[in-house]
Amino acid sequence: MVAADRLARARAAAASVPDPEIPALTIDELGMLHDVALIGDTVEVAITPSYLGCPATVPIAQDVATALARAGFPNARVRTVLAPAWSSDRITAEGRRKLAASGIAPPDRALPQPRCPRCGSGETEQISAFGATPCKALHRCLTCREPFEAFKCH
């Protein structure tokens, strides 16, 4: 198999891994897949956690290694890179769409408060800086009165 084909297959396998904390999105859509390289005959994948100390980093690395093994790369290496640091700006347009479809307001630096993912209102308030995961906060829509999580801008 040609190196470019192997690299494309490895990238597709790594990119398909869902985030364990937000399984509707892949690590690629969240912008955590930093690099996929072919070094000699070995595939090396670099992932960037969404924040320092993210508890999902180890399970994500294990899931990437498993996905690569299933794709025919049993000796692949997965490493964590911290620089450049992850930013919520790395979330793809598709990732933002999937967050909203899952009831999680995507991050938007241009807005003072996140828009309600249910009704679209910008009239929201933060209830708690802490959501189900450290990368999210709990909000409430003042229009439809529904609570929702919002992905924090980093």
Label the predicted regions.
Residues M1-H154:
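Domain-level signature for proteins that mediate thiol-based redox and metal-cofactor handling
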